[in-house]
From Swiss-Prot:
Transmembrane segments: none annotated. The gene is rplM. Part of the 50S ribosomal subunit. GO terms for biological process: negative regulation of translation; translation. Keywords: Ribonucleoprotein, Ribosomal protein. This protein is one of the early assembly proteins of the 50S ribosomal subunit, although it is not seen to bind rRNA by itself. It is important during the early stages of 50S assembly. CDD domains: Ribosomal_L13. This is Large ribosomal subunit protein uL13. NCBIfam families: rplM_bact.
Length: 142
């Protein structure tokens, strides 16, 4: 029996909506990464994007355990001399809560062209409202 290899034009993508309220950031992000990569499907193929679209709402109400709010931070460089910047999780959660969830999922996706394509299917919103009612997303309980 031959192994099945999915083709790009045969993949059927669904839309899922996830409520992040009260969920732990890392556990939520790993489940979202599985859906984006398509590893939850039986027709998963490593070189084809078989994943589904994921909408995350209430990103501002995500939970971090322990002292991570104060101790952990994201580091980035502006590209200019002396441009190394750090932003703590507490500040990021207060200013741009959707970026905290986005970066957590981004770290769990492959760092390739295919990974960047998978990450485009992630839509994160700080509050309850989102712009994707026309896609009729299915509620997903993680």
């Amino acid at each position: 029996m031959k192994s099945y290899m999915a083709k790009t034009n045969e993949v059927e993508r669904k839309w899922f909506i996830v409520d992040a309220e009260g969920k732990t950031l890392g556990r939520l992000s790993s489940e979202i990464a599985k859906i984006l990569t398509g590893k939850n499907k039986p027709e998963y193929t490593p070189h084809v994007d078989t994943g589904d679209f994921v909408i995350v709402v209430n990103a501002e109400k995500v939970v971090l355990t322990g002292k991570k709010l104060d101790q952990e931070s994201y580091t980035y460089h502006t590209g200019h001399p002396g441009g190394l910047k750090q932003i703590s999780f507490r500040r990021m959660l207060a200013e741009k809560p959707e970026l905290l969830t986005y970066h957590a999922v981004k770290g769990m996706i492959p760092k390739t062209r295919l990974g960047r394509q998978m990450l485009k299917k992630l839509k994160v919103y700080a509050g309850e409202n989102h712009d994707h009612e026309a896609q009729q997303p299915q509620a997903l309980e993680l």
